[in-house]
Amino acid sequence: MKLIVGLGNPGEKYAKTKHNVGYWVLDLLAEKLALSFDQKTENGIYVKQPDFILAKPTTFMNKSGDFVEELIKFYKINTQDLMIIYDDMNFEVGQAAIKTTGSAGGQRGMAHIIEKCKTKEIKRLKIGISRGENAKEYVLSPFLPKDNAKIKLVIEEAANILIFYLSNSFITTIEKFNANKNKV
């Protein structure tokens, strides 16, 4: 069973911030699949299908690993079937990258997930948000109007890639993503 987790911060205050692009991708993915997040735990919300789970932690970003660990243990999911979607300041707005492993790159939600899962071997889909002077203020602010079209396009592409991934291998998904990379 595949577990796809979109990271963000809960609450209306953070809904339109750069740090919530993981939520945005999951929301669009669920919408495209005509699914709703109908299951809830203390740490998050999710929708379970026979072959996959889409999940959003409702803890603050730096505690995202608690919810991921909870779902992995309860549903006996192998971390090889886990994919995390989150914002990355090392990529420009409009860029995305799929990785099979690596460090958290300063992203505290991903760092907590790596800590809880006890491995860096976690698939991830990083959504570029560019870099600001004050990282904390920057990630907790909305995108500039000039970036809205780019971010909308990359969120759409990310959701489409995940739809493809749900019925294909990760290797095939990476190949398709890389073939389409220059089109985003």
Curated annotation (Swiss-Prot):
Family assignment from sequence similarity: Belongs to the PTH family.
Species this protein is from: Mesomycoplasma hyopneumoniae (strain J / ATCC 25934 / NCTC 10110) (Mycoplasma hyopneumoniae)
Domain of life of the native organism: Bacteria
Subcellular location: Cytoplasm
Sample GO molecular function, one term: peptidyl-tRNA hydrolase activity
Any GO BP: rescue of stalled ribosome
Record-linked CDD domains: PTH
Coiled coil: none
NCBIfam families attached to this UniProt entry: pth (TIGR00447)
Enzyme Commission code: 3.1.1.29
Disulfide bonds, paired cysteine numbers: none
Gene label: pth
Predominant localisation class: cytoplasm
Site (Discriminates between blocked and unblocked aminoacyl-tRNA): 9
EC primary class: hydrolase
Recorded catalytic activity of this chain's protein: an N-acyl-L-alpha-aminoacyl-tRNA + H2O = an N-acyl-L-amino acid + a tRNA + H(+)
Protein name (record): Peptidyl-tRNA hydrolase
Assembly description: Monomer.
